[in-house]
Amino acid sequence: MKIKVKLFARLRELAGTNTIEINTPENTTIAELIETLQTEYPKLAAAAANTIVSLNKDFAELQTHLHEGDEVALFPPVSGGSGSAGSDEKFAITYDPISLDDMAAKVVKPKTGAVAVFGGVVRNISGGKDVDFLEYEAYEAMAVAKLKQVAAEAREKWPKIVDIAITQRIGQLDIGENAVIVAVSSPHRGDGCFEACAYAINRLKEIVPIWKKETGPDGSEWIEGDYMPSTTDAQ
């Protein structure tokens, strides 16, 4: 059976390609598929301990059996945060500049009395090293779905929320540019808009497949998170 494998960020660079189509026997598991890939692309083994797996755009266990036409993605822990095709108005991955005012306007409704907005901005230093610019990469189809999941989780925790919008910018971003914006509205400031906004950006950094590469005078480096999602983070 034919399986499509997509690779992102450091794993894409280690393999030297972003997509691999591979023929495997029936009932092959994800773990067995990865073993085959590491044989054909030995450099991938160096990142095995920090590799996250998704199956058909959601998190999956290594012992899951694959089927004809499945899409497996391999990527490192996400580092997103600080409309393209497939994005909708309130949950978007985009190459275009993003605005705090525009995002706030998306969540203002007649019963809105409070809006909390978080903006992640590209800074010129990270970990004590100078930074010239950042490059963001995303597994776009899965990322939009996970942005919606983050919003749904926030609504469940703070049911008085009126609306929520999240947009992540990808591509090359210069110092001072907005990388990610979260906007949350509620009837009153005490109805959860602050808490939901903070929850959303923190959760984005855990489960939304977005990565960043920092470039400065000392060269370029992929920045990886430390949260390892599991099937409990699946929708």
Explain the meaning of each model-derived region:
Residues K4, F8, E71-P77, G83-V180, ...:
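N-terminal, polar/charged subdomain of small-to-medium soluble alpha/beta proteins
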Residues M1-G86:
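Ubiquitin-like/PB1-type beta-grasp interaction modules and other compact soluble beta-rich domains
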